[in-house]
UniProtKB/Swiss-Prot annotation:
Keywords: ATP-binding, Chaperone, Cytoplasm, Isomerase, Nucleotide-binding
Keyword Transmembrane: no
Species of the source: Syntrophobacter fumaroxidans (strain DSM 10017 / MPOB)
Subunit comment: Forms a cylinder of 14 subunits composed of two heptameric rings stacked back-to-back. Interacts with the co-chaperonin GroES.
Reactions it catalyzes: ATP + H2O + a folded polypeptide = ADP + phosphate + an unfolded polypeptide
A GO molecular function held by the record: isomerase activity
UniProt similarity note: Belongs to the chaperonin (HSP60) family.
Name of the featured protein: Chaperonin GroEL 1
Pfam family, one: Cpn60_TCP1
Presence of keyword Transit peptide: no
Subcellular location: Cytoplasm
Family annotation (NCBIfam families): GroEL, PRK00013.1, PRK12849.1, PRK12850.1, PRK12851.1
Length: 543
């Protein structure tokens, strides 16, 4: 396949054009008075969003060289979203500014490699300064403020997220779902919950709610299928004498074993319920071990040399209550040994640190939360599906931002944190083109504050100069169009988001500045449709 190449100024101009097209579409969404972007979908109605990364991901340009520039900035937004969960629009604006200023200097004869070194040194100084400015989140109120800002100044979302974090802790799992109703609600599940319900509806104890409630039950955890009744009989006889309820967790319970359990339940001989084991493969084994440690039981497994027919009461787990519906099982207050539980938690934390897979990390964090905190579910409600999707995206953004704030602390919002780093850059001594690279970063750090002011209908440069003339958290609150102490006003950003946005923007922009040649495939020309069959009279085709 033949390729087309462009060099030098033409290459950088094409890149800049692509960067500008994408960044101009994204930056209108920045700040409390940022505008929405409407995106056409192949199926269904259009999507309305104010989320930078959602806009960026939809942009694909016709010109192949311009598209490369757009895709590289899209990578900045995506990477920032993956690492910090928010700050995608800020990262895009910073990338555009660094590349725009840098490409002018390269065109004027500056050395791109020296510029790159200067940019990298300047960014490191800013990152260190941000860490100095950063303050840890003190209370639920500050967490709510971070959530509110990230959810485009929606205090309802901020408060719900703060309440969820307060209830399940820093490591608790918070999931976001679409609600059936109009209201946005929070439900907290205490204890360990896994997504397996009862195998047979005949086990139900509350027909109105279609739930099974077991008080002070014993728990039999079996790795394999149970289909033969005679294997179960010895342990069932011991439990029947005690008169306590029993929960059986196994790969499956079927045939004769299931029929016998159902008959005994209906007769009232045995208060029992059976559920399938959660997860698959190795993850299933790990989750069964988690349940065993949480409840103080044993996993009945041939690998461990324990057979079902030889199980005693000491091998069974215990809990205060277990609630089972058709989809979920919740174990509350397991009777496991505290030290064993702490050891398991340490082991899972180590695995989280060592894993390189995002999917595995997410699953390990879910397991950790089930062991230590519990699970909170935020159900997002709205009047229409379009509004619900937009609101759900805002809730997810706000959730990521609050997690980042708890992790690394907070800095003043509204682009002020970047402006407060300018003093540290002024104290850095660099020579030649490296100094020009530092000046590029200085100029770029003003852009987020300038854009927030412009989106609010103010003169950006005037606002930036006024904020630069003051110190600390003094800044412009675009929501009220007032100058004030932003931390007191609740306009705060997570340090992790602010830091990650700059690092990713500088990394990609500096790479683009050192580009000297671009290569792409030559677009194929569509050939006309083949001519029709000649020589036949009108209407003389085949029937």
């Amino acid at each position: 396949m033949a390729k087309q190449l462009i060099y030098d100024v033409k290459a950088r101009e094409a890149l800049l054009s692509g960067v500008n097209i994408l960044a101009d579409a994204v930056k209108v969404t920045l700040g409390p008075k940022g505008r929405n972007v409407v995106i056409e979908k192949a199926f269904g109605g259009p999507t309305v969003t104010k989320d930078g990364v959602t806009v960026a991901k939809e942009i694909e340009l016709e010109d192949k060289f311009e598209n490369m520039g757009a895709q590289m900035v899209k990578e900045v937004a995506s990477k920032t979203s993956d690492v910090a969960g928010d700050g995608t629009t800020t990262a895009t604006i910073l990338a555009q500014s660094i590349y725009y200023e840098g490409s002018k200097l390269v065109a004027a004869g500056a050395n791109p490699m020296a510029l790159k070194r200067g940019i990298e040194k300047a960014v490191q100084v800013v990152v260190d300064e941000l860490k100095k400015i950063s303050k840890p989140t003190k209370d639920q109120k500050e967490i709510a403020q971070v959530g509110t800002i990230s959810a485009n100044n929606d205090p309802t979302i901020g408060n719900i997220i703060a309440e969820a974090m307060n209830k399940v802790g820093k490591e608790g799992v918070i999931t976001v779902e679409e609600a059936k109703a109009m209201e946005t609600t929070l439900e907290v599940v205490e204890g360990m919950q896994f997504d397996r319900g009862y195998i047979s509806p005949y086990f139900v104890t509350d027909p109105e709610k279609m739930e099974v409630l077991l008080n002070e039950p014993l728990i039999l955890i079996n790795e394999k299928k149970i289909s033969n009744m005679k294997d179960l009989l010895p342990v069932l006889e011991q439990i029947a004498k005690m008169g306590r309820p029993l929960l059986i967790i196994a790969e499956d319970v079927e045939g004769e074993a299931l029929a016998t359990l159902v008959v005994n339940k209906l007769r009232g001989t045995l208060h029992v319920c059976a559920v399938k084991a959660p997860g698959f493969g190795d993850r299933r084994k790990a989750m069964l071990d988690d349940i065993a440690i949480l409840t103080g039981g044993q996993v009945i497994s041939e690998e461990k040399g324990i057979k079902l027919e030889s199980v005693g009461l000491n091998d069974l787990g215990k809990a205060k209550t277990i609630r089972i519906d058709k989809d979920n099982t919740t174990i509350v207050d397991g009777a496991g040994d505290r030290k064993a539980l702490e050891g398991r938690v340490r082991q899972i934390r180590t695995q989280i640190d060592e894993t390189t897979s995002d999917y595995d990390r997410e699953k390990l964090q879910e397991r950790l939360a089930k062991m230590v905190g519990g699970v909170a579910v935020i159900s997002v409600g709205a009047a229409t599906e379009t509004e619900m999707k937009e609101k759900k995206a805002r809730v997810e953004d706000a959730l990521n931002a609050t997690r980042a704030a708890v992790e690394e602390g907070i800095v003043p919002g509204g682009g002020v944190a970047y402006l407060r780093c300018l003093g540290a850059l002024g104290a850095v001594n660099l020579e030649g083109d490296e100094k020009l690279g530092l000046n590029i970063v200085k100029r770029a750090l003003e852009e987020p504050a300038r854009q927030i002011a412009m989106n609010a209908g103010e003169e950006g440069s005037v606002i930036v100069q006024r904020v630069k003339s003051e110190t600390g958290a003094f800044g412009f609150d675009a929501e009220t169009s007032q100058f004030c102490d932003l931390i007191e006003a609740g306009v705060i950003d997570p340090t992790k988001v602010t830091r990650t946005a700059l690092l990713n923007a500088a990394s990609v922009s500096a790479l683009m500045l050192t580009t000297e040649c671009m290569v792409s495939e030559i677009p194929k020309e569509d050939k006309g449709a083949p001519a029709g069959m000649g020589g036949m009279p009108p209407g003389g085709g085949m029937y």
